[in-house]
Design a protein with these regions (language model features):
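Helix-to-loop junction immediately C-terminal to a conserved catalytic motif
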Residues: 14-46
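A cross-family acyltransferase "interaction/gating" segment
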Residues: 130, 134-203
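Catalytic core of membrane glycerolipid acyltransferases/transacylases, capturing the structured
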Residues: 34-100
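Short hydrophobic helices that act as membrane-entry/anchoring signals
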Residues: 2-21, 85, 89-92
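Charged, low-complexity C-terminal accessory regions
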Residues: 197-240
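Short glycine-rich anion-binding loops that position phosphate/pyrophosphate groups of nucleotides
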Residues: 46-48, 125-128
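Short amphipathic alpha-helices and their capping/turn segments at secondary-structure boundaries
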Residues: 106-114
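Residue-level preference for the first positions of well-ordered beta-strands
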Residues: 39-41, 117-123, 158-160
Length: 240
């Protein structure tokens, strides 16, 4: 599928979704007019396989960049499902089947991410949150180190964060058919990658960049919670 036809597909998804769901969306800082220099898209608070619903809130200029150069991983179990895997492959020019291990699948994803024009998407918690607030193994929803590796690798452009209010009220893992005509809560934040890296270096020890990124993103997730999450009353590092 070429970029134009994929863009048309994404626009159709957006229009259909907006007839079914209402969106409560906030831009924490100024909403950009275009996303040509956006290199990294981070989804925080991963709760459902129905997160493509968020496309209903994406600006058309963002959809165009996704249609041309988006690269994102999908869990191998999800990727291998005939219908679901096919649908997820329609959303981007390159979709990578990823295992839970640092193996060849991760190396392949990183190789694609290194390409000059790539627009990388990642849900850095790795697993979906269940109704009890934990992952399917009963573990806390912590940020994994892979996102810090990607940030280290990038030397220009912007990072766009989507803070999800959660989709358990629409469809929780294992619950089947999604509920219709609900409100979707989300926030966006965008900032310069190099400024972010410089800030993380300043607030961390020499060899603790990864830990600083993980801590900061977890605080941002908690601070920018919406109705399905509880705020922790903490402040993330301000990016100037």
């Amino acid at each position: 599928m070429g970029s134009f036809f994929r863009f048309c597909f994404l626009v159709c998804v957006k229009l259909v979704v907006r007839t079914i769901y209402r969106f409560d969306q906030v831009w924490i800082n100024s909403k950009p007019e275009e996303f040509k220099d956006t290199k990294l898209f981070v989804l925080l608070n991963h709760t459902s396989l129905f997160e493509p619903i968020f496309i209903g809130a994406f600006p058309y200029s963002l959809l165009w960049q996704m249609a041309k150069r988006f690269v994102y991983p999908v869990a191998d179990k999800t990727f291998s499902r005939p219908l679901v895997g096919f649908l997820f492959r329609l959303f981007a020019p390159q979709t990578v089947s990823l295992t839970r291990n640092r193996d060849n699948s991760w190396e392949h994803f990183i190789a694609l991410a290194k390409e000059k024009n790539s627009f990388i998407g990642i849900a850095p918690e790795g697993r979906m949150k269940r109704l009890n607030g934990l992952d399917k193994h009963g573990m806390p929803m912590n940020i994994k180190s892979g996102v810090a590796d990607i940030i280290k690798m990038l030397d220009s452009g912007k990072m766009l964060i989507l803070y999800s209010g959660g989709l358990h009220h629409i469809q929780s893992p294992g619950s089947g058919i999604p509920k219709l005509f609900k409100k979707v809560h989300l926030k966006f934040e965008i900032f310069d990658i190099n400024q972010y890296k410089e800030t993380m270096i300043k607030v961390s020890d020499k060899d603790e960049f990864t830990r600083a990124v993980i801590s900061d993103l977890q605080l941002r997730r908690d601070m920018n919670c919406t109705p399905e999450a509880e705020c922790q009353g903490k402040l993330a590092v301000k990016i100037v």
